Design a protein with these regions (language model features):
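Aromatic pocket-lining residues of Rossmann-like dinucleotide-binding sites
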Residues: 26
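Conserved glycine-rich cofactor-binding loop
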Residues: 15
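Flexible N-terminal pre-Rossmann segment of NAD(P)-dependent oxidoreductases
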Residues: 1-8
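N-terminal Rossmann-fold NAD(P) dinucleotide-binding loop
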Residues: 19-20
Length: 272
């Protein structure tokens, strides 16, 4: 796998230093598939009642795509995202990432897989206040076999990629909300994950900072070829993604092309 030509950037869009990326299949349009959900249902028990958070979901997400999962509160967006990230388990059906069936993995296997392939970004940044931006971004690498010098190179590359090369020694209290989210994104990409999973990444930001973060995610997708799956309520997000997936009451109701797509926008019914 070739590295990007950008100076000092080691992020490749494919899991360069943590383990081999999985082989991938192709969808009906010839695009490589990053994620495939096949008749996935997720139910929970609440007292004597069964709650169906996701109901027979089938969809694919293309490799190097930037997709938004949207719908009203309680529609199952975060549940779907948690299944893709290997944080939760499907009650039935199959979740494939590349050619790896993650629904059959035990907790130990799933944790190891998640560390290799998934970068997580949340609405709240979850930065440790006693650590600098550099030290916060370095945290995931402390669990790897990289040397201190190698970790330094990866951290500097990640912070440069999010536009914070000059803020490495700053503590969270010295950063704006948008800058804190950039640190959180750098922490998510520092291991060069296969997929970046973002849950309401602009939900705690003002309008300008939110748009800056969406532009950054677009850059990571376009320049560094990251597959990005984002849950959001923010209608502005539709301008920045390739495809919007719509959920309602746990049901996948269709998809439409986003503003970054080269195709005409229009509702597309889910595949049978």
């Amino acid at each position: 796998m070739s590295r990007l030509a950008t100076k000092n950037i080691l992020i490749t869009g494919g899991n360069s230093g943590i383990g081999p990326a999985p082989a991938q299949e192709f969808d009906r349009e010839g695009a490589r598939v990053a994620v495939k959900l096949d008749h996935v249902t997720r139910t929970y028990r609440r007292d004597e009642f069964e709650v169906r958070a996701l109901d027979d979901i089938s969809l694919t997400i293309p490799t190097q795509g930037f997709v938004a999962i949207m719908g009203p509160s309680g529609s199952g967006k975060t549940t779907l995202l948690n299944l893709v990230a290997g944080i939760d388990h499907a009650t039935s059906g199959s979740v494939m990432v590349g050619e790896e069936e993650i629904t059959t993995m035990n907790e130990r296997e799933l944790a190891a897989w998640r560390a290799r392939h998934i970068g997580l970004v949340f609405q709240f940044y979850n930065l440790l206040p006693v650590l600098t931006a550099f030290e916060n971004v370095e945290l995931p690498l402390l669990l790897t076999h990289l040397s201190k010098a190698e970790r330094k190179t990866h951290v500097e590359s990640a912070l440069q990629a999010v536009g914070l090369a000059d803020r490495m020694d700053h503590y969270p209290r010295q950063l704006s909300g948008g800058q804190e989210q950039r640190v959180a994104i750098a922490r998510a990409i520092v291991t060069d994950p296969t997929i970046l999973v973002a849950d309401e990444p602009t939900g705690d930001l003002d309008a300008k900072s939110a748009e800056d973060i969406l532009l950054l995610l677009t850059q990571l997708n376009r320049q560094f070829h990251k597959t990005i799956v984002m849950v959001t309520h923010d209608p502005r997000s539709e301008r920045f993604v390739d495809t919007v997936y719509r959920l309602d009451k746990g049901v996948f109701i269709g998809s439409e092309k986003g503003g970054m797509s080269d195709h005409t926008t229009g509702l597309v019914a889910p595949a049978e």
